[in-house]
């Protein structure tokens, strides 16, 4: 199972303890926020995103740092300000086919936490969709498609989709984003059916 497979700065995680540390909703949001910003962010900035106090957010940042999931970033000039960043570009979470029950349960908890976050985003969009401009309303897309593939074809499909997304990742974009650009959640999953 993956979050993203092709990235030269990919971090691979198979340790159940690390997976459990990552499975907290606030930590998922913190890592996502920091991963979208090349310069990183402060605990206060992260707190605004996750809806916690800066001190509670600092606790979560330290917990993530314990496992190397975040690290202190170079200062923006204010020595009193502590910046954090995600050291790798993407994360591969994979207990492995032969994983024991503890690793399998930790992987499942982490994937389910991400699935809950994805569903929350979808519900949020549906609640406010009528207030969006026609431009954004008309370009939002929901699709659920069953396809017939070999394992090799599925691997090729996954790589092709990830390759299409790669240039749009905030940390990979060159220069300032175009006027009117917004963060868009692209929720892509491929799961072989029984």
Give each language-model segment a name.
Residues 20-24, 42, 75-98:
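Short, cationic-aromatic polyanion-contact patches
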Residues 68:
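Glycine-centered, phosphate/nucleic-acid-interacting loop/turn motifs that mediate DNA/RNA or nucleotide
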Residues 131-194:
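Charged, low-complexity intrinsically disordered regulatory/assembly segments
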Residues 2-29:
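Short alpha-helical segments that sit at the start of domains
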Residues 24, 35-38:
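Short helix-capping/hinge SLiMs at alpha-helix to coil transitions
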Residues 85-147:
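Amphipathic alpha-helical dimerization/coiled-coil segments
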Residues 45-49:
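A short acidic, leucine-rich amphipathic alpha-helix
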């Amino acid at each position: 199972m993956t979050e993203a497979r092709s990235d030269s700065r990919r971090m691979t995680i198979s340790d159940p303890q690390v997976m459990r540390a990552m499975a907290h909703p606030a930590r998922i949001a913190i890592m996502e926020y920091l991963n979208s910003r090349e310069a990183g962010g402060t605990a206060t900035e992260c707190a605004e995103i996750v809806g916690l106090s800066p001190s509670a957010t600092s606790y979560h940042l330290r917990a993530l740092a314990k496992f190397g999931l975040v690290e202190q970033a170079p200062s923006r000039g204010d020595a009193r300000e502590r910046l954090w960043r995600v050291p790798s570009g993407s994360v591969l979470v994979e207990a492995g086919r032969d994983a024991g029950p503890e690793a399998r349960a930790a992987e499942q908890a982490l994937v389910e936490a991400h699935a809950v976050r994805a569903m929350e985003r979808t519900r949020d969009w549906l609640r406010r969709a009528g207030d969006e401009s026609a431009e954004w309303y008309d370009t939002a897309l929901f699709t659920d498609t069953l396809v017939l593939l070999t394992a090799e074809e599925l691997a090729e499909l996954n790589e092709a989709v990830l390759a299409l997304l790669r240039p749009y990742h905030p940390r990979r974009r060159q220069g300032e984003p175009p006027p009117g650009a917004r963060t868009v959640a692209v929720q892509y999953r491929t799961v072989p059916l029984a």
